[in-house]
Amino acid sequence: YNYNKGKEVKHMIQTYRNHTPRIDATCFVADNATIIGDVTMKADASVWFGSVIRGDKDHIEIGEGSNIQDNCTLHTDPQHVLTIGKHVTVGHNAILHGCHIEDEVLIGMGAIILNGAHIGSHSIIGAGALVTEHMQIPKNSIVVGCPAKVIKTISAQQIQEIQDNAMHYAQLGKEYKEM
């Protein structure tokens, strides 16, 4: 099925072990993104150029209005589903592996989040941060470093910026679908 307005596009959307990705018709998937297996994308989500989403070991869910920017890798292990809430931004080159991301979170460019980690809503994970296995990040946190640590509480203005960024990417995805 072509998710980009009837253009002849060779997406790498593949069935694996009888699991075919379920992608809402309102989603944008870049031409060279790869989505395999047990993956669900909710309304207005987007996956950008060069990203790989492999639901070959367990389920991956990308919430409504969330965006997976260029060259990201999303993967799982058995018993480590990957769940991304609503209006989440996953910055360029980030790696998410078997973790849970609540609503309205910004994952900075190049950040790595490992199995069993849980990121609370309205949080920012700084660029290049390493969130280790099973780490629990409380909601409203700003997190940086390798290994990651909470450095302060997010401001109302920063929460608004997270929301605005997610809305911007939802609109951008609609524009790209029209190209």
Predicted segments with their positions:
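Short, Lys/Arg-enriched N-terminal segments with co-localized hydrophobic residues
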Residues: Y1-H11
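C-terminal segments of enzyme domains that contribute to small-molecule binding surfaces
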Residues: M12-A25, A30, L82-V90, A94-I95, ...
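Left-handed beta-helix
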Residues: A25, A30-D31, I36-G37, K42-A43, ...
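Active-site cofactor/substrate anionic-group-binding motifs, chiefly glycine-
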Residues: I60, V81
